[in-house]
Regions:
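Glycine-rich Rossmann-fold phosphate-binding loop(s) that bind the pyrophosphate
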Residues: 1-7, 27
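Conserved Rossmann-like nucleotide-cofactor binding loop
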Residues: 5, 30, 195
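Gly/Ala-rich phosphate-binding loop of Rossmann-like dinucleotide-binding domains
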Residues: 10, 14, 151
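Glycine-rich FAD pyrophosphate-binding loop
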Residues: 14-38
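Local beta-strand N-terminus motif with an aromatic residue
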Residues: 18, 74, 185-186
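General small-molecule cofactor/ligand-binding pocket signal
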Residues: 23, 110-113, 158-160
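Dinucleotide-binding Rossmann-like beta1-alpha1 core, especially the glycine-rich loop
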Residues: 41-121, 127
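Helical element adjacent to the flavin cofactor pocket in flavoenzyme catalytic cores
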Residues: 131-187, 191-198
């Protein structure tokens, strides 16, 4: 799959194992056309994840690495922070747990804001309270996709488009059957997004 996960995986493999052959099979005419191309562009910092969990640790490290990658490739991004807004007392109570979770995940600068404080930041926001999360960010994910493609190709990898995997066969090697041809490899990494279960079958 040629979404953000498949492309980032290919890039890492090429960096960690110089000289290997890596091919990304993408079913669409261009990479990043599904979930990657339609997401909100938010860089999540780990606020919502269980403290100590792998997901929380990867979110904290991932936002750092993504900001570094974007700076290196001149990709529009900003660590602009966000407000988590409580619209009623029940949400305000839950926000305290979110605050504690964020602190446990190592997020610095979290601030509890009252209605006046949050409206100083965003005058048009509705709600009774907010949690200011300075580490959250935004990014142009289509630009990230194109930078990953360029880097993969510069490292000797290839992106094969219009290559929907219609079948997989295992003998001495794996062979992926696609409309663009059959491709054999020692290893296949399934990064097919929402369709990864179908590919696995």
């Amino acid at each position: 799959g040629g979404g953000i996960v498949g492309l980032a995986t290919a890039r890492q493999l090429l960096h960690h194992y110089p000289g290997i052959t890596v091919s990304v099979l993408e079913k669409e005419p261009e990479p990043g056309q599904h979930q990657t191309g339609h997401n909100s562009g938010v860089l999540h910092c780990g606020l919502y994840y269980t403290p100590g969990s792998l997901k929380a640790r990867l979110a904290v490290e991932g936002i750092r690495q993504m900001a570094e990658f974007c700076s290196l490739h001149n990709i529009p991004h900003e660590i602009c922070g966000k407000l988590v807004v409580a619209t009623n007392e029940a949400e305000a109570t839950r926000m305290e747990k979110l605050y504690q979770r964020g602190k446990a995940n190592g997020l610095e600068g979290l601030e509890k804001l009252d209605q006046n404080q949050m409206r100083e930041i965003e005058p048009h926001v509705g709600g009774i309270a907010a949690l200011k999360v300075p580490q959250e960010g935004i990014v142009d994910y289509p630009a990230v996709v194109m930078a990953l493609v360029r880097e993969i190709e510069s490292l000797g990898g290839q992106i094969i488009t219009n290559a929907k995997v219609n079948g997989l066969h295992e003998a001495n090697q794996w062979t992926a059957i696609t409309p663009a041809g059959d491709y054999s490899a020692d290893w296949i990494i399934n990064c097919a997004g929402l369709h990864c279960d179908r590919v696995s079958q």
